[in-house]
A protein has these predicted regions:
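Bacterial Sec signal peptide processing site at the extreme N-terminus
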Residues: 24-34
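Active-site SXXK
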Residues: 83-103, 111
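C-terminal motif of bacterial Sec signal peptides marking the signal peptidase cleavage site
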Residues: 17-21
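Acidic helix-start/capping segments at beta-turn-to-alpha-helix junctions
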Residues: 70-75, 107-129, 274-281
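Penicillin-recognizing serine hydrolase domain
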Residues: 27-29, 39-65, 74, 128-282
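Short, conserved catalytic-motif segment at the N-terminal edge
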Residues: 62-83, 99
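N-terminal export and membrane-targeting signals
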Residues: 1-13
Length: 282
């Protein structure tokens, strides 16, 4: 992502590089659910629709594509698992962890709305200062809400956070007390970053994108939450295209996100997806 400042420290430069780069073999997976109000056949129907959206996007853009949704106790994924670098989507839990430690909201505005790397690094440093280990604090935050990631201890953009786990955390965003402000500003992403899920109604999302120079692949990821009448569905997606073509990846994300939100809305309307309406005490 764009970093307009110069003269950073070596550590900060490394961190910013890995995020500003803000990057599996396709497969289909459904995360196990111990209990859910939607039946197995309902989930199979939704999974089939997700598979179709993934296949259409992959063929149209010659891309590796993955999606995941989380509603209630059920998490359904299709396509690529999204186990590459998480890029700037990791700024969401970093901002939440920093707010727990009293971070300035203006830094959250910059890190989330504009995906500013300097602001994200400052938030990360604040968590490190207060908690002693920023990577552990962010990882513990995710674990507390049933989402799991391998957080890189310095270059946080290279953390690994699979799509199904991002979707799980996305569904919990409205329920995390310290995430209230992050949830709010996710609706105010700057115009040039209003791509894919961020364009869709009743959907709040954070993007992350980057180039893998060794593989010559460009990755665009998003995760967030779709909310209707107080009910929430976590959503995550990833598109990996060949070469350095940001515009191609962005177009693929738009195409995929519109299908994904349509599947979620239809699934909720038809009772095939049963989103949570209340938050659990934690």
């Amino acid at each position: 992502m764009k970093n307009k400042r110069l003269g950073v420290s070596l550590l900060e430069a490394l961190t910013l590089l890995t995020v500003s780069a803000c990057s599996g073999e396709p497969g289909t997976e459904s995360a196990p659910a111990s209990s859910t109000t939607s039946s197995a056949s309902d989930q199979d129907l939704v999974r089939t629709q997700l598979d179709r959206a993934v296949d259409k996007t992959a063929k149209k853009y010659h891309a590796q594509v993955g999606v995941a949704i989380s509603a209630g106790d059920a998490t359904i994924a299709a396509g690529d698992k999204g186990e590459g670098p998480v890029w700037s989507t990791i700024k969401v839990p970093i901002a939440i962890a920093a707010l727990k430690d009293g971070a300035d909201k203006s830094l959250v505005d910059l890190a989330i709305k504009e995906s500013d790397n300097d602001a994200a690094y400052t938030l990360w440093s604040q968590v490190q200062w207060h908690e002693g280990s920023a990577d552990k604090a962010v990882g513990d935050l995710l674990d507390a809400y049933g989402s799991h990631a391998d957080i890189h201890d310095t270059a946080f953009g290279y953390s690994t956070w699979p799509l199904k786990d991002q979707a799980v955390f996305g569904a919990q965003l409205p329920c995390i007390e310290e995430a209230d402000y992050v949830h709010k500003v996710l609706k105010d992403i700057v115009s040039w970053q209003k791509v894919g899920l961020s364009k869709e109604k009743q959907t709040r999302a954070k993007s992350g994108w980057g180039l893998d120079e060794e593989e010559n692949e460009y990755t665009y990821r998003q995760f967030g939450v779709h909310e209707v009448a107080g009910k929430r569905v976590g959503i995550a997606l990833s598109v990996v295209t060949d070469g350095e073509n940001y515009a191609e990846a962005e177009s693929a994300v738009d195409y995929l996100a519109h299908q994904l939100v349509g599947i979620v809305e239809a699934g909720v309307d038809e009772g095939n997806i049963e989103p949570a309406a209340q938050c659990e005490d934690r």
